[in-house]
Amino acid sequence: MENPYEKVQSNILARIIGNVERLNQSVVILNQELRRVNTKNKNLELMSQMCENYRESVDFQLQATSKKQDPL
């Protein structure tokens, strides 16, 4: 005897499988975008550190040469 719910169950499973496949594709895209954002953030962090080091160097040089002035 055939299970009366078999067709309904197989349809539900097919929908679940389709939804999981779409979810996996979305997660892959999200991971790619996060990698891209992280790369840009690393570049921004490096640039920020370079600017901070430059500012500290200029500040040190101005103090060493006694040419540092108070802000206006």
UniProtKB/Swiss-Prot annotation:
Keyword Cell cycle: yes
Pfam families: DASH_Dad4 (PF08650)
GO annotation terms (biological process): attachment of spindle microtubules to kinetochore; cell division; mitotic sister chromatid biorientation; protein transport along microtubule to mitotic spindle pole body
Chain segments annotated as coiled-coil in the UniProt record: 18-53
Keyword field contains Coiled coil: yes
GO CC annotation terms, alphabetical: cytoplasm; DASH complex; microtubule; mitotic spindle
Predominant location: nucleus
InterPro entries: DASH_Dad4
Keyword terms: Cell cycle, Cell division, Centromere, Chromosome, Chromosome partition, Coiled coil, Cytoplasm, Cytoskeleton, Kinetochore, Microtubule, Mitosis, Nucleus
Location of this chain's protein in the cell: Nucleus; Cytoplasm, Cytoskeleton, Spindle; Chromosome, Centromere, Kinetochore
UniProt record similarity statement: Belongs to the DASH complex DAD4 family.
Quaternary structure and partners: Component of the DASH complex consisting of ASK1, DAD1, DAD2, DAD3, DAD4, DAM1, DUO1, HSK3, SPC19 and SPC34, with a stoichiometry of one copy of each subunit per complex. Multiple DASH complexes oligomerize to form a ring that encircles spindle microtubules and organizes the rod-like NDC80 complexes of the outer kinetochore. DASH complex oligomerization strengthens microtubule attachments. On cytoplasmic microtubules, DASH complexes appear to form patches instead of rings.
Annotated function: Component of the DASH complex that connects microtubules with kinetochores and couples microtubule depolymerisation to chromosome movement; it is involved in retrieving kinetochores to the spindle poles before their re-orientation on the spindle in early mitosis and allows microtubule depolymerization to pull chromosomes apart and resist detachment during anaphase.
Protein name: DASH complex subunit DAD4
Lineage: Eukaryota, Fungi, Dikarya, Ascomycota, Saccharomycotina
Encoding gene per record: DAD4
